[in-house]
From Swiss-Prot:
One of its GO terms (biological process) is defense response to virus. InterPro entries: Cas9 (IPR028629), HNH_CAS9 (IPR033114), HNH_nuc (IPR003615), RNaseH_sf (IPR036397), RuvC_III (IPR041383). PROSITE patterns: HNH_CAS9 (PS51749). The active site is at 16 (for ruvc-like nuclease domain), 588 (proton acceptor for hnh nuclease domain). The keyword Hydrolase applies. Keywords: Antiviral defense, DNA-binding, Endonuclease, Hydrolase, Magnesium, Manganese, Metal-binding, Nuclease, RNA-binding. This is CRISPR-associated endonuclease Cas9. HAMAP family: Cas9 (MF_01480). Pfam families: HNH_4, RuvC_III. It comes from Neisseria meningitidis serogroup A / serotype 4A (strain DSM 15465 / Z2491). Belongs to the CRISPR-associated protein Cas9 family. Subtype II-C subfamily. Mg(2+) 1 binds at residues 16, 504, 508.
Length: 1082
């Protein structure tokens, strides 16, 4: 295939970046940077870098499993050393051990023996059982005095159990934890060990240490010869030794170094200097919106607030308002006034300062009324020590020569820190003095270090370098930006450097999982509100034809908020005429042409005649507010008595009016992710456009507005192509286009949501969508065909899925626009990032009994709280215990097969006389088990977990699939058995040298399967090991095809053709994979 070599193109690249997708579009521009032609577009889809259901890091499951393996391994090694010690000290002889090094005939009643050891001499085997039991179950050892103040619920429950049991031992009713366990736990709850999620039976390791010492003393009294000092010291060391938590230099090594001072470590966030830096950043960036103008705090206002966070545990916006003496018409920029009591939220909290202060107060070392009497340098040292070190011993070692012993003891009891900032204390101490003078962070950095981002690489390159992981800590954002980089470089590689890059990031990008869930919750609430409003609208207007549109519902909503009156004239609005054409209009109170503000807070309901009279003025200008006219006073009264939110009232009543500021805020997205990406691209990438600002972050609200004006229909639920639709709009949002729209709106005195304008000279009603400035003629029709491969509104139309078909369709439908047909026109094919990772979960967590595996059955112990009716039917010994089966079934049926509710109360067996006997907590259930992973020395079996690869072989015009699991990769096993439908793995087809290797499949590899019935072309989703069939994901995940965009159960063994393809990030270069040798698994 010949290389693609386009002619030089002057174009803008538009990007629509989400947390799992990047839509892109190239729009050619003329010399004045007006969009003139759609060159190319596409979508890149990838898996978000988090667990979808929980938002946890993808590494968390591995990290937790690794921690469990380490704990198990360390426990096993501890017991091994204990057995060796027992043998070395003569407690046990060689004959007491089996071939695996385990002790033969070891008593299995260690709790009882621990109690008996207080009153009689134990035999060597009994004494060994006691010592090994103490080392195996050695309780909890706290290394910090303040752990009891944790916010972690699980740790809190554990610490409570430890404290309660320590208190019970101190009462003197029980000599040792073993006596407490036997005489209290076992008698009261029927068990000694902790049960699921319960930590009330946990002991302190120090209490177990005291028991060990007492047992040695008692056994010595009873004449036990095996109580030497060496044995006691060795056992006590094994009991008490614990690996220290990662701290000190190890923590600093992981954190890295300062952005500005590369030789310096990053500062702890809970130091005095770091907290002051954070406060000064907020203070110097705080903006007041008043009468339409935006201003920073004056020097006097800054001085008023400067020390308030030290005086108050939390400084709120409401408190700041009172201290500054702000008028009711003034508001804090960036605060969401739509929610209740917005100013009750915290402006600044000096957490470390007040934590230290409270700690000293609790121990009587500080006067409640006096400020904290510790120097900033000492507070920095305290914050650093408590952040870096994790044990009282290490913290004491760092601070003992700096702080009085009683102060250090108070701090150890009550504080704990663990967060860091990106800058060192050395850099902060240089930057903070300038910020105290009123300079912003970037200004202070520029004065000292020359740049906000430290030493910036200003070399412009053709391709964008990798996104620095140390600057973008959120893995979800890092993956999204990294994929966007791949798309940018792919476009440059194919078409050359762009003139400009326009970026829009979805609002969830950069948000935490919790915040994104809150956004989803609000969206769902808004959807329900719209449904209620639509239902209410239909009640008011039962004869309304069709479904009410958002504009209709908005009219009713505004009508109610304005008490049924025109906001401009005060005249009553006839509700029955609400839908009458031209009777009422939705107006932008602050003219759209001067603000680009299309938010709800800028919309009011007025009579059509009033709207035309107001024209391009603000209400303040229209009603002659500068002379405080009677009309202005009446208007103010109507606004104040309306049901508008406070922020909307303030906006409508604006007097001073900063047009440039409004436009800048509404046209640009200034979130950190956008600022970072724009700066990163602008600093490092060669762009050919005019002027300095060649990278622009578009506001999503403006994209939505323009998409509607330009007639582009977006349905997210249909498929993944809609991301490209937004990218086209983002690319076309040029400065020249914005100026055209502004001039049009100003000239026509338009209403942005009325759908019509009035020509003043002729009085003719002009339909807005016809006359609203378009990037080019037939823009909407061309874009919809390019994105979806068919005309808009014609789902039955066959998709033009080849360049020839697409060009023919464009030529037929847009005969008046020959420019739409050019050499770069190709169908949109969604590119999906393949997952070629070969590691993963080795096997499922549940280990089942393998005693009956030769029957194809495994046995699993299922807790009653997880037992469903379908599981109950497979209960072991169901025929032998019919009463138990019937009782369990009745309980489940009574609670509609909800085991959590059914067995919230304990369940007991009953004897023939009807007396309650044994509590049942779980039952054994049979499961079909044809394969799995052997564990626990072939005593248990677990289900396979991740199928990381499928190798495809061919022989005699038939295809054979060999699944490869992560556990096989870990062991270096390259399987040689191909799936045979309905057979056990041992009976699968053996792959020998007579088979030809074709290719390896990973999730999201592009494949083509041709059968006698159809051709299927899409992304490999999964393979069914029971049937040998595969599932293929449609490239755009069109939900109308297959099952939610997935073609399931495709048999490939007898396929006419089965081929794997390579695809680039843009979805443009698609070619068959070359034949290779079968790759190893490691």
């Amino acid at each position: 295939m010949a290389a693609f070599k386009p002619n030089p193109i002057n174009y803008i690249l538009g990007l629509d970046i989400g947390i799992a997708s990047v839509g892109w579009a190239m729009v050619e521009i003329d010399e004045d940077e007006n969009p003139i032609c759609l060159i190319d577009l596409g979508v890149r889809v990838f898996e978000r870098a988090e667990v979808p259901k929980t938002g946890d890091s993808l590494a968390m499951a591995r990290r937790l499993a690794r921690s469990v393996r380490r704990l198990t391994r360390r426990r096993a090694h501890r017991l091994l050393r204990a057995r060796r010690l027992l043998k070395r000290e003569g407690v046990l002889q060689a004959a007491d051990f089996d071939e695996n090094g385990l002790i033969k005939s070891l008593p299995n009643t260690p709790w009882q023996l621990r109690a008996a050891a207080l009153d009689r001499k134990l035999t060597p085997l009994e004494w060994s059982a006691v010592l090994l039991h103490l080392i195996k179950h050695r309780g909890y050892l706290s290394q910090r005095k303040n752990e009891g103040e944790t916010a972690d619920k699980e740790l809190g429950a554990l610490l409570k159990g430890v404290a309660d049991n320590a208190h019970a031992l101190q009462t003197g009713d029980f000599r040792t934890p073993a006596e407490l366990a036997l005489n209290k736990f076992e008698k009261e709850s029927g068990h000694i060990r902790n049960q699921r999620g319960d930590y009330s039976h946990t002991f302190s390791r120090k209490d177990l240490q005291a028991e060990l010492i007492l047992l040695f003393e008692k056994q010595k009294e009873f004449g036990n010869p095996h109580v030497s000092g060496g044995l006691k010291e060795g056992i006590e060391t094994l009991l008490m030794t614990q690996r220290p938590a990662l701290s000190g230099d190890a923590v600093q090594k992981m954190l890295g170094h300062c952005t500005f001072e590369p030789a310096e470590p990053k500062a702890a966030k809970n130091t005095y200097t770091a907290e002051r830096f954070i406060w000064l950043t907020k203070l110097n960036n705080l903006r007041i919106l008043e009468q339409g103008s935006e201003r920073p705090l004056t020097d006097t206002e800054r001085a008023t607030l400067m020390d308030e966070p030290y005086r108050k545990s939390k400084l709120t916006y409401a408190q700041a308002r009172k201290l500054l003496g702000l008028e009711d018409t003034a508001f804090f920029k960036g605060l969401r006034y739509g929610k209740d009591n917005a100013e009750a939220s915290t402006l600044m909290e000096m957490k470390a300062y007040h934590a230290i202060s409270r700690a000293l107060e609790k121990e009587g070392l500080k006067d409640k009324k006096s400020p904290l009497n510790l120097s900033p340098e000492l507070q920095d040292e305290i914050g650093t020590a408590f952040s870096l070190f994790k044990t009282d011993e290490d913290i004491t070692g760092r601070l003992k020569d700096r702080i009085q012993p009683e102060i250090l003891e108070a701090l150890l009891k009550h504080i704990s820190f663990d967060k860091f900032v990106q800058i060192s204390l050395k850099a902060l101490r240089r930057i903070v003095p300038l910020m105290e003078q009123g300079k912003r962070y970037d200004e202070a950095c520029a004065e000292i270090y020359g740049d906000h981002y430290g030493k910036k690489n200003t070399e412009e390159k053709i391709y964008l370098p990798p996104i620095p992981a140390d600057e973008i800590r959120n893995p979800v954002v890092l993956r999204a930006l990294s994929q966007a980089r791949k798309v940018i470089n792919g476009v440059v590689r194919r078409y050359g450097s762009p003139a400009r890059i326009h970026i829009e990031t979805a609002r969830e990008v950069g948000k935490s999982f919790k915040d994104r869930k809150e956004i989803e919750k609000r969206q769902e609430e808004n959807r329900k509100d719209r449904e209620k409003a639509a239902a209410k609208f239909r009640e008011y207007f039962p004869n309304f034809v069709g479904e009410p549109k958002s504009k209709d519902i908005l009219k009713l909503r505004l009508y109610e908020q304005q008490h049924g009156k025109c906001l401009y004239s005060g005249k009553e609005i006839n509700l029955g005429r609400l839908n009458e054409k031209g009777y009422v209009e939705i107006d932008h109170a602050l003219p759209f042409s001067r603000t680009w503000d299309d938010s709800f807070n800028n919309k009011v309901l007025v009579l059509g005649s009033e709207n035309q009279n107001k024209g391009n003025q603000t209400p303040y200008e229209y009603f002659n507010g500068k002379d405080n006219s009677r009309e202005w006073q009446e208007f103010k009264a109507r606004v104040e008595t309306s049901r508008f939110p406070r922020s909307k009232k303030q906006r409508i009543l604006l007097q001073k009016f900063d047009e440039d500021g409004f436009k800048e805020r509404n046209l640009n997205d200034t979130r950190y992710v956008n600022r970072f990406l724009c700066q990163f691209v602008a600093d490092r990438m060669r762009l050919t456009g005019k002027g300095k600002k060649r990278v622009f972050a578009s506001n999503g609200q403006i994209t939505n507005l323009l998409r509607g004006f330009w007639g582009l229909r977006k349905v997210r639920a249909e498929n993944d192509r809609h991301h490209a639709l937004d990218a086209v709009v983002v690319a076309c949002s040029t400065v020249a286009m914005q100026q055209k729209i502004t001039r049009f709106v100003r000239y026509k005195e338009m209403n942005a949501f009325d759908g019509k304008t009035i020509d003043k000279e002729t009085g003719e009603v002009l339909h807005q969508k016809t006359h609203f400035p378009q990037p080019w003629e037939f823009f909407a029709q061309e874009v919809m065909i390019r994105v979806f491969g068919k005309p808009d509104g014609k789902p039955e139309f066959e998709e033009a899925d080849t360049p020839e078909k697409l060009r023919t369709l464009l030529a037929e439908k847009l005969s008046s626009r020959p420019e739409a047909v050019h050499e770069y026109v190709t169908p949109l094919f969604v590119s999906r990032a393949p997952n070629r990772k070969m590691s993963g979960q080795g096997h499922m967590e549940t280990v089942k009994s393998a005693k009956r595996l030769d029957e194809g059955v495994s046995v699993l112990r299922v807790p009653l709280t997880q037992l469903k009716l379908k599981d109950l039917e497979k209960m072991v010994n169901r025929e032998r215990e019919p009463k138990l089966y019937e009782a369990l079934k009745a309980r489940l049926e009574a609670h509609k097969d909800d085991p959590a509710k059914a067995f919230a109360e304990p369940f007991y067996k009953y004897d023939k006389a009807g007396n309650r006997t044994q509590q049942v907590k779980a039952v054994r259930v049979e499961q079909v088990q044809k394969t799995g992973v052997w564990v626990r020395n072939h005593n248990g079996i677990a289900d396979n977990a991740t199928m990381v690869r499928v190798d495809v072989f061919e022989k005699g015009d038939k295809y054979y699939l060999v699944p490869i699991y992560s556990w096989q990769v870990a062991k270096g096993i390259l399987p040689d058995r191909a799936v045979v439908q309905g057979k056990d793995e041992e009976d699968w087809q053996l792959i020998d040298d007579s088979f030809n290797f074709k290719f390896s499949l990973h999730p999201n590899d592009l494949v083509e399967v041709i059968t006698k019935k159809a051709r299927m072309f899409g992304y490999f989703a999964s393979c069914h090991r029971g049937t040998g069939n595969i599932n293929i994901r449609i490239h755009d995940l069109d939900h109308k095809i297959g099952k939610n965009g997935i073609l399931e159960g495709i048999g490939v063994k007898t396929a006419l053709s089965f081929q794997k393809y390579q695809i680039d990030e843009l979805g443009k270069e698609i070619r068959p994979c070359r034949l290779k040798k079968r790759p190893p698994v490691r």
